[in-house]
A protein has these predicted regions:
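Conserved alpha/beta-hydrolase "acid-adjacent" motif
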Residues: 114-124
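Acidic beta-to-alpha connecting loop that harbors the catalytic carboxylate
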Residues: 111-114, 145-146
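Catalytic active-site module of serine/aspartate enzymes centered on a nucleophile-bearing elbow/loop
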Residues: 130-167
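Alpha/beta-hydrolase-fold enzymes
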Residues: 1-70
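Non-catalytic cap/lid and distal C-terminal segments of serine-dependent acyl enzymes
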Residues: 1, 90-91, 161-163
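Short, conserved loop/helix-junction motifs that constitute active-site signature segments
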Residues: 97-101, 132-134
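Short beta-strand/loop motif that positions the catalytic acidic residue
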Residues: 107-109
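Active-site nucleophile elbow and catalytic-triad environment of alpha/beta-hydrolase enzymes
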Residues: 75-97
């Protein structure tokens, strides 16, 4: 769930990652690149006790995330490059091979998820699916929710919505 919006700086970011990887190696974990990619995500939720407040409206989820040693890591430069490559591929209409135009596509996201950047950018992603030929493209934004909509206190509602779409 969630839909990262296209970032016009993705090509420049990828070039920076590649240059940094030549100097540091592709397994290097760059604090600078992490800040460039995710640093602004928490801004709308300040003041916040965690740099990961952007993940969830539910403070218990954020506290558990902060406490989990497997969470909160910094991507390697290779990881950032892959993330940017995927974004550039997904948002390039030339790369889509339309085989099943009737396949339903449903976007769902928290309305306050910083990955979607803005509702307008989110709707551009929805529009791209129509542009490449999908005929049944719909979306739902969940009011007040952030990135991890399937872990919120109201998750049963979201799972019910998903179940209804699948039936």
């Amino acid at each position: 769930c969630g839909c990262p919006s296209y970032n016009p700086a993705a090509k420049m970011g990828r070039a920076m990652v590649r240059a940094m990887a030549k100097l540091k190696g592709d397994r290097y974990r760059s604090q600078k690149m992490n800040h460039m990619m995710f640093g602004a995500f928490n801004t709308p939720f300040q003041p916040a006790d965690s740099e990961f407040a952007w993940l969830s409206l539910n403070e218990e989820n954020v506290t558990a995330y902060d406490a989990d040693e497997l969470c909160g890591f910094i991507f390697t430069l290779n990881g950032f490059e892959s993330l940017l490559d995927i974004m550039l591929m997904v948002y390039d209409p030339k790369g889509w091979k339309m085989e099943r135009p009737g396949l339903p596509v449903w976007f769902l996201s928290g309305e306050q998820d910083p990955c979607l950047t803005s509702k307008e950018r989110f709707l551009e992603a929805v529009g791209l699916m129509k542009k490449v030929g999908y005929q049944d493209v719909t979306y739902k934004l969940y009011d007040g929710l952030r990135h991890e909509i399937l872990n919120e206190k109201c998750k049963e509602t979201i799972y019910q919505d998903i179940l209804e779409k699948l039936e």
